Amino acid sequence: MNIRPLHDRVIVKRKEVESKSAGGIVLTGSAAGKSTRGEIIAVGKGRVLENGNTQPLDVKIGDTVIFNDGYGVKVEKIDNQDMLIMSESDILAIVEA
């Protein structure tokens, strides 16, 4: 399915959380928790400013990001995978290799 978010929205595929503790214990279920890292799958054209101009987003397709997993983040099933739709302002950082 082709999908393009509007304005300053992005679509993020959540990365799997590490399932082992620091001591090597395998974590399952809620103990493993949800990851707040993901990969940008699609981006909107940018935020529309008051003067009508569009400010491009700082993130791009393929970026790994850390995001705020809370209010305003929508989970949607796309191609049988859960994807997150959020505003760029919900992204806290870009992970640089």
Swiss-Prot record:
Kindly give the InterPro entries that the UniProt entry links to this protein. Answer: Chaperonin_GroES, Chaperonin_GroES_sf, Chaprnonin_Cpn10_CS, GroES-like_sf
Pfam families, per database record: Cpn10
Chaperone: is it a keyword of this entry?
Answer: yes
GO biological process annotations for this chain's record? Answer: chaperone cofactor-dependent protein refolding
Transmembrane portions of the chain: none
Q: Where in the cell is it found?
A: Cytoplasm
Q: Does the keyword Chaperone apply?
A: yes
Q: Tell me where it mainly resides.
A: cytoplasm
PROSITE patterns registered for this protein in UniProt: CHAPERONINS_CPN10
What's the domain of life for this entry?
Bacteria
Query: How is the subunit organization of this protein annotated in UniProt?
Result: Heptamer of 7 subunits arranged in a ring. Interacts with the chaperonin GroEL.
Concerning NCBIfam families, the annotation shows: PRK00364.1-1, PRK00364.1-2, PRK00364.2-2
Q: Which family does it belong to?
A: Belongs to the GroES chaperonin family.
- Which named protein is this? Co-chaperonin GroES
The species this protein was found in: Buchnera aphidicola subsp. Tuberolachnus salignus
